[in-house]
């Protein structure tokens, strides 16, 4: 498949804009869209953000994380389909769907352990399905966001394998609008393949291997 490499020049990423609710966006993305519809990224190619390059070494989020580009960043878009691609080596979050509607994410392979805040999938959306994905990342694997007054709602996550040095599945930290009608089922939580940045990876504590606390979720001890 085709290999698409992200630029390592920060000057190529400049998407600052205000939201209607008064907040200011400072993030950018290799693949960026705002206010668009009928977007598809499909096929079996690889998108590599080259996020380990020295141009993106600013430290963690508090020290300028949003200056680093994401690989996919869609804002206020609808009818989005992202299937079967491989996403690697993001400088920041791998993919972020903010204030989006009608999103289908299926069959992705996500691997990113090259920088701080390497979340695998951050979704702040309505009416979304996420399925059959393999996500192995340094920070949160799948993270639900609610960064604006609207609910993050009507989302299903199923048949995914997540591996993370932080949180496999997380709600927040941005939790302004809240969450509603979100289902996570038949997922596997594994240890991350690498632990390059914060060295958070360790055995789960106070959990017995013979205790299942969430139906349909397997945890590798």
Residue ranges and their predicted role:
Residues 1-221:
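Extracellular/periplasmic carbohydrate-active domains that bind, remodel
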């Amino acid at each position: 498949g085709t290999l698409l490499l992200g630029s390592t020049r920060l000057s190529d990423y400049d998407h600052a804009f205000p939201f209607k609710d008064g907040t200011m966006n400072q993030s950018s993305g290799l693949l960026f869209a705002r206010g668009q519809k009928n977007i598809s990224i499909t096929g079996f190619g690889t998108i590599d953000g080259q996020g380990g390059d020295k141009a993106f070494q600013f430290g963690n989020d508090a020290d300028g994380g949003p200056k680093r580009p994401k690989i996919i960043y869609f804002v206020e878009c609808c009818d989005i389909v992202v299937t079967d691609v491989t996403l690697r080596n993001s400088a920041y979050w791998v993919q972020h769907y903010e204030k989006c509607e009608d999103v289908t994410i299926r069959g992705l392979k996500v691997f990113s352990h090259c920088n701080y805040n390497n979340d695998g999938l951050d979704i702040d959306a309505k009416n979304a399905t996420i399925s059959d994905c393999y996500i192995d990342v340094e920070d949160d694997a799948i993270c639900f966001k609610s960064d604006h007054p609207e609910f993050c709602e009507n989302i299903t996550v199923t048949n995914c394998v997540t591996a993370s040095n932080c949180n496999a599945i997380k709600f927040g930290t941005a939790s302004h609008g809240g969450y509603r009608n979100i289902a996570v089922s038949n997922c596997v939580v594994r240890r991350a393949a690498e632990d390059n940045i914060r060295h958070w990876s360790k055995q789960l504590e106070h959990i017995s291997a013979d205790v299942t606390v969430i139906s349909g979720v397997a945890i590798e001890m």
